[in-house]
Amino acid sequence: MTSTGKDGGAQHAQYVGPYRLEKTLGKGQTGLVKLGVHCVTCQKVAIKIVNREKLSESVLMKVEREIAILKLIEHPHVLKLHDVYENKKYLYLVLEHVSGGELFDYLVKKGRLTPKEARKFFRQIISALDFCHSHSICHRDLKPENLLLDEKNNIRIADFGMASLQVGDSLLETSCGSPHYACPEVIRGEKYDGRKADVWSCGVILFALLVGALPFDDDNLRQLLEKVKRGVFHMPHFIPPDCQSLLRGMIEVDAARRLTLEHIQKHIWYIGGKNEPEPEQPIPRKVQIRSLPSLEDIDPDVLDSMHSLGCFRDRNKLLQDLLSEEENQEKMIYFLLLDRKERYPSQEDEDLPPRNEIDPPRKRVDSPMLNRHGKRRPERKSMEVLSVTDGGSPVPARRAIEMAQHGQRSRSISGASSGLSTSPLSSPRVTPHPSPRGSPLPTPKGTPVHTPKESPAGTPNPTPPSSPSVGGVPWRARLNSIKNSFLGSPRFHRRKLQVPTPEEMSNLTPESSPELAKKSWFGNFISLEKEEQIFVVIKDKPLSSIKADIVHAFLSIPSLSHSVISQTSFRAEYKATGGPAVFQKPVKFQVDITYTEGGEAQKENGIYSVTFTLLSGPSRRFKRVVETIQAQLLSTHDPPAAQHLSDTTNCMEMMTGRLSKCGSPLSNFFDVIKQLFSDEKNGQAAQAPSTPAKRSAHGPLGDSAAAGPGPGGDAEYPTGKDTAKMGPPTARREQP
């Protein structure tokens, strides 16, 4: 698999299945996007490469959620997912390739669009969004950077990394999206309807198409968030009156009064234009929802995809709903995914180029279990199969193969191969440790344990020596434990350290030498931390002001994400960036607001106690984060600069005038604001950042705020670029 370059030297060509990797198309938070060319048909695709080793489990779960959501959506204006490949280190998403670039760059080049062209783009966006909402999917990160154009200048909605399934009348909690396009309820940290949040974002996009500027803009992040919450913006006179009423209905602070997609599609400006073609609509598909008699009739691949969506985390409840006789949301989503699987079966590639790689990417293929009618399909001669545990829980195909290979390697070392088959299908069933089914990287708590089963004669099958047995010889168990700490599990060569159970600890160290257990090197990494709390007392402030200050403090700290638990409780997570991975353990803590003193009449301005409780993570880093939040809570005037909380000094880039275009939109806002606050504190005049080369200062979308790696965890902001100053100052005047 080599090709000769001009200098006569051999250059290795990289392949993902039948696709040859070529130039890099872009770079995001989760990895690179490269151009792929099919070795036979020359079809071009975009291959998103996700490095599993460099991303946290929560981010990888979001990648799996994006895969499941893209399987649910088939629309001409939504980017298509073709296939998924994977090996031990990388995950490869084979996506539709569109050559027109981003709508953002199109706006930078052309300036504000004519109402006719803006209506064409807007109709396509609304058509695709309406299809997503009809399948209970909310995008939550709509902006021109995530809207791509094909060769005919038609819209493709991309980047569903922040998308969520909103079932029924439930509300969402995660604060995500870009500040210029986020609705007020998201900015305030309240629970919100994802569908209404998408409508607000579409209103901001339509304004940008028609004006070439954003309705809410400010160099100061705090001022920007305040403008969004007020919802007051300047409406240029050149916007048609009908369109002005549509914009005011979409960019409405009160979510209850905000227009719905149904009202938008009936609006006179949306319908207008007699000679304009209607947006292309997908062929409606009627999926029959039928009853599922038993667990054996449930397709394991579809079950995996549903669990990856994130809203069906309770596996037992999901199975109960699927087996119910009544029609419900779970069954509708199940049969939609099953219908997609039957129409686009994922099978092994037939013609692959010759490869000499040690661990080539393998295609995710359908398990040979059930078809849509509950009957077993004939098995393919493929190693990519699905193993099922005793409890009925499916194990991913790659995991099952490597478990079997690990068992073979162990037997070849010990010579105990008489009672075990070498086939991954006929080997003893494997009981994996519980892990989120939606995660592509389930973290094992140890080497997989092959559960011995009684043979018909009554003699148990031998247990592979690689599996530490509680009843085994202590020194052998200790030796195996040391060996596994170097080798890792069959799938992962670097395991996360887990707190061992007392039973495991007793096997790690012989009983005759308790001193070794006390001085074990595990103690340097595993600490059973006691609950640590920090209290902050606040006087003469109403509860609403305290909550707003806490949310603003969260938003002003890079790499900190939060979610709302109740009216007076938040949960936050801070992830340090840079430095060795061993020092990047996230800090998780809870914030509770309690009323401590004063009568009911004084409750509005009484004494409140804000309690910060450390849930997990380093205590010192927790205290530094709380100190930063505390300084902002107790400040009555200008907020202090957000401190640099990382343990390394190379994480923060000061204003250089060359702000990167990729990464999270908020993180570089934070970097700039930190410098601005610092300058103000020292009595200096704060200077705005320089204009990036790509955003011409003379164009209607001249300046832009940079994007960097976004905060992680549940309240993570997505990868992408953000717009800061879209348009000349005259177009950004705010109404008094």
Swiss-Prot record:
Pfam short name (any one): KA1_BRSK
Post-translational modification: Phosphorylated at Thr-174 by STK11/LKB1 in complex with STE20-related adapter-alpha (STRADA) pseudo kinase and CAB39. Not phosphorylated at Thr-174 by CaMKK2. In contrast, it is phosphorylated and activated by CaMKK1. May be inactivated via dephosphorylation of Thr-174 by PP2C. Phosphorylated at Thr-260 by PKA. Phosphorylation at Thr-260 by PKA was not observed in another study, but this may reflect differences in the experimental approach. Phosphorylation at Thr-260 seems to play a role in the regulation of insulin secretion.
Regulation: Activated by phosphorylation on Thr-174 by STK11/LKB1.
Domain annotation UBA: ranges: 297-339
Motif KEN box per record, residues: 603-605
EC assignment: 2.7.11.1, 2.7.11.26
Protein origin, superkingdom: Eukaryota
GO cellular component labels: centrosome; cytoplasm; distal axon; endoplasmic reticulum; perinuclear region of cytoplasm
Amino-acid positions noted as binding ATP in the UniProt annotation, renumbered to this chain: 25-33, 48
Subcellular location: Cytoplasm, Cytoskeleton, Microtubule organizing center, Centrosome; Cytoplasm, Perinuclear region; Endoplasmic reticulum
Phosphothreonine modified-residue sites: 174, 260, 459, 463, 509
Gene Ontology BP annotations: actin cytoskeleton organization; axonogenesis; cell division; central nervous system neuron differentiation; ERAD pathway; establishment of cell polarity; exocytosis; G2/M transition of mitotic cell cycle
Cell cycle listed as a keyword: yes
Class of enzymatic activity (EC top level): transferase
Biased composition (Low complexity): 410-428, 699-708
Basic and acidic residues bias spans: 345-366
Ranges of Pro residues composition bias in the record: 431-445
SMART domains xrefs: S_TKc
Reaction(s) catalysed by this chain's protein: L-seryl-[protein] + ATP = O-phospho-L-seryl-[protein] + ADP + H(+); L-threonyl-[protein] + ATP = O-phospho-L-threonyl-[protein] + ADP + H(+); L-seryl-[tau protein] + ATP = O-phospho-L-seryl-[tau protein] + ADP + H(+); L-threonyl-[tau protein] + ATP = O-phospho-L-threonyl-[tau protein] + ADP + H(+)
UniProt note: domains: The KEN box motif is required for interaction with FZR1/CDH1 and essential for APC(CDH1)-mediated ubiquitination.
Role played: Serine/threonine-protein kinase that plays a key role in polarization of neurons and axonogenesis, cell cycle progress and insulin secretion. Phosphorylates CDK16, CDC25C, MAPT/TAU, PAK1 and WEE1. Following phosphorylation and activation by STK11/LKB1, acts as a key regulator of polarization of cortical neurons, probably by mediating phosphorylation of microtubule-associated proteins such as MAPT/TAU at 'Thr-529' and 'Ser-579'.
Assembly mode: Interacts with FZR1, a regulatory subunit of the APC ubiquitin ligase complex. Interacts with COPS5. Interacts with PAK1.
Protein name: Serine/threonine-protein kinase BRSK2
Source organism of this protein record: Homo sapiens (Human)
The encoding gene: BRSK2
